[in-house]
Amino acid sequence: MLERLSQRQPFRSALMSEKDRAMAARWAKVLGIGVVVVAAGAVTAWALTKPQPHEAGYWSSVGQADLAKGEQLFWAGGCAGCHAAEGAEGDAAKILSGGLALKSPFGTFHVPNISPDPKAGIGSWTLAQFGNAMTRGVGPNGEHLYPSFPYGSYARLSAADVNDLYGYMKTLPPSSNVEPPHELGFPFNQRLAVGGWKLLYFDDGPRVELASADDKVKRGQFLVEGPGHCGECHTPRNALGGFEKGQWLAGGPNPEGQGSIPNITPGSKDIGAWSEDEITEYLSTGFTPDFDSVGGSMVEVQKNIAHLPKSDLQAIAAYLKAVPAR
């Protein structure tokens, strides 16, 4: 009996071994499929969230920069409001040395030097590097830029617009000032995550559809939604910093934590009741219809935008009266 059992044992052991090998093969197949799926997901995620500059040929189509148009875009964009020294006036407002610290729920962003200085500023950048930073949020080394820089609005500038602006900015005084790095905690200090933010919120299309807009309103739409980047402050945001859908220019909490930013749609209790002429006057002089004056962070905005021709201020006013009331 014992002899017969001992003779069967090798067969049983061999049988179990075959089962083990079959199970191991199945697990290996499952794990292999899992690895492929994870790898494919990682590749897809990278493809969707990687920095996406314009094609190189996009910038080669421009000709000589129109410096007068570039200056208008400079003032419309409020470049001096963030990149010049606080309170700078006259020619000092054209020294874009950086220095402003923007406090947000995500940390503190230090506004950089964008003067023509080749080391501390952007003087060594090519048009493509400048343009991709402005309109795609991609830095000179191919990195994501944080959306504290409003490239989501500047994305509406054409290649010619960017060329004109950069041409003008290269005529401004250089500065050797060097700003400290941003002060952001994890995970906001990971630029890779910005690619996911762009996937969710970066959009270069119209913020609102205005089917019956005339040329004046269309010009105002370009100025407000594009270089003027009015929505960056006047539109409420969600927890991830994206615009609240359907609330364009409806106002909301001050992103820097103090007070609120007003509603500037026709549904506002204040500016909503103003006429186009009154809005134009406010943008030009800083005085409201009640003879009050502009205050807070809007002081710097109004000071910059007042450099625009009256026709542009009228276009902005027409657009603000045309957007949906909120």
What are these regions (language model features)?
Residues 1-68:
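N-terminal export/targeting leaders of redox proteins
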Residues 32-46, 157-221, 236, 312-319:
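Extended surface/linker regions that mediate inter-domain or inter-protein docking
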Residues 51-75, 196-225, 268, 273:
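Electrostatic cytochrome c docking/interface patches
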Residues 53-58, 68-71, 84, 91-120, ...:
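Sequence context of c-type cytochrome heme-c attachment sites
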Residues 70, 76-86, 130, 165, ...:
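The canonical Cys-X-X-Cys-His
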Residues 99-131, 152-162, 247-288, 301-314:
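Electron-transfer interface patches adjacent to heme c in soluble/periplasmic c-type cytochromes
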Residues 107-109, 185-204, 236-268, 277-278, ...:
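Primarily the internal scaffold of c-type cytochrome electron-transfer domains
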Residues 140-143, 240-241, 271-273, 286-295:
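Substrate-binding/catalytic groove segments of enzymes
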